[in-house]
């Protein structure tokens, strides 16, 4: 059974005890996880009252241990977008399993106006939590033109089967630039962990 929660969210702040990177709008992200037994869904507007939808959904599903990391990763992946998120976790023992959020986003900014998708995952590892986020966004320009929009200090890290891979400046994760005709799909990946 899927529970639906409709909540509006505006600007968000990452939890201060978590170590994750801020990603610039051009840096966009995908992580795969097994299906959960419990789910929640929210519609979120980019310019509404501040709330933390990711933390709220995790709490409603019984996730306590990794709720802060999940929320910080979710806020990072959806930064600057209106979005809808569906959150899933593993049934009755939710706090002992990973929590996953699948995010559909719409950007309407001066530098990027399009749809994007993201996935955030946080899971207990020993006494702490670790997580990942991925955001995927298409750009209507060639990848060689998108490279200049990567964060300052970004460096080429080689290629994976011909797909360019970049280490993002400021320790913000990695980005793959996938050419698709005259367009470029940017896939950004970042990791996070509890630090306190």
Regions found by a protein language model. Name each.
Residues 1-20:
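N-terminal secretory signal peptides that target proteins for export/translocation
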Residues 24-34:
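Bacterial N-terminal signal peptides
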Residues 43-124, 190-192:
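N-terminal secretory signal peptides
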Residues 166-169, 173-183:
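Short, exposed beta-strand-loop hairpins at the edges of beta-sheets
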Residues 194-196:
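Short, solvent-exposed mixed-charge patches
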